[in-house]
A protein has these predicted regions:
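Short acidic (Asp/Glu) and glycine-rich catalytic loops that position anionic groups and cofactors
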Residues: 72, 98-105, 132-133, 168-177, ...
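Hydrophobic alpha-helix feature that most strongly marks membrane-spanning transmembrane helices
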Residues: 101, 109, 125-132, 143-144, ...
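Short, low-complexity, polar/charged sequence segments that are solvent-exposed and flexible
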Residues: 90-93, 113-116, 125-127, 157-158, ...
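Short C-terminal domain-edge/linker segments immediately following a structured domain
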Residues: 126-127, 137-139, 168-172, 192-194, ...
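Generic structural "secondary-structure junction" signal
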Residues: 72-75, 92, 106, 146, ...
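An internal, acidic/charged active-site-proximal segment
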Residues: 32-33, 131-186
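Polybasic low-complexity intrinsically disordered regions
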Residues: 1-136, 140-142, 150-152
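Basic, amphipathic alpha-helical segments enriched in Lys/Arg and hydrophobic/aromatic residues
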Residues: 40, 44-45, 54, 179-238
Length: 238
């Protein structure tokens, strides 16, 4: 390469980009140009990571864990979300907690793609941190169901725990009666309709803001807007 520079292990495009950035760093004193160089360096590093992961997966046949994959050079924080054997999504898992008031009481935004079964106790603990106690009743999605999660919830003081899918659990172990279990299951269905409302009316189906911090801000702004509308409807005379 010109000037005797050599970039081992890299193709010509990577070497050319690195050389251009080096020349800018050495010769430019213009702040705007240096900012462009920093941006080039950022995307150049991400591009090299994409090339390396492609070489490992496609050429070497190596299976990479999701945490090591870059699926977007513009939003590198994006996680690969796999729901059972269904569709694959890109973004972040969001766990919402709602109450009888129809308000969203809490939101847990998770990085990575942890199994749903690892999340319930964290959500319950957050309720205790916010309100000073654990809820007396809890209705959760079927993906959260496990004997350990049921035991942890009961130990925390939750009297009735309803998982939408039993997954081998007995109603008698979860709730005091079939009646309570059915009531909680219907309540959880109402939470699902609230989530659909957030997606349809408040843009929660897709985030258009850049960066993980902005992603969290976008999610919370949608939730706050929905809660404010719910409160205003309750306070409006009919």
């Amino acid at each position: 390469m010109p000037g005797g520079l050599y970039y081992p292990g890299g193709d010509s495009s990577r070497g050319t980009t690195a050389l251009a950035i080096e020349c800018i760093d050495q010769q430019s004193i213009d702040v705007s140009v240096l900012a462009i160089a920093a941006e080039l360096r950022h995307f150049g590093d991400l591009a090299q990571q994409v090339i390396r992961q492609t070489e490992r997966r496609v050429i070497a046949g190596e299976k990479l864990p999701p945490a090591e994959k870059i699926v977007s050079i513009f939003e590198p924080h994006t996680d690969i979300i796999v729901k059972d054997n269904r569709d694959t999504f890109f973004g972040h898992k969001i766990c919402l907690t709602g109450g009888g008031s129809n308000l969203i009481l809490d939101c847990l935004i998770v990085q990575g793609n942890p199994a749903d079964s690892t999340l319930p106790q964290t959500m319950l603990d957050r309720q205790r941190q916010i309100y000073g106690r654990y809820p007396l009743k809890a209705a959760l999605d079927g993906g959260f169901a496990s004997k350990d999660n049921l035991q942890d919830a009961k130990t925390s003081g939750v009297k009735d725990v309803c998982f939408a899918k039993k997954r081998g659990l007995k109603v008698a172990d979860m709730c005091r009666s079939d009646y309570v279990y059915k009531r909680l299951r219907r309540f959880r269905a109402g939470i699902e309709s609230g989530i659909s409302w957030l997606k349809r009316s408040f843009g929660l189906w897709r985030c258009a803001w850049k960066g993980f911090a902005s992603f969290k801000s976008y999610v919370w702004s949608s939730i706050v807007a929905a809660n404010l509308l719910t409160l205003s409807r309750r306070s409006t005379p009919t």
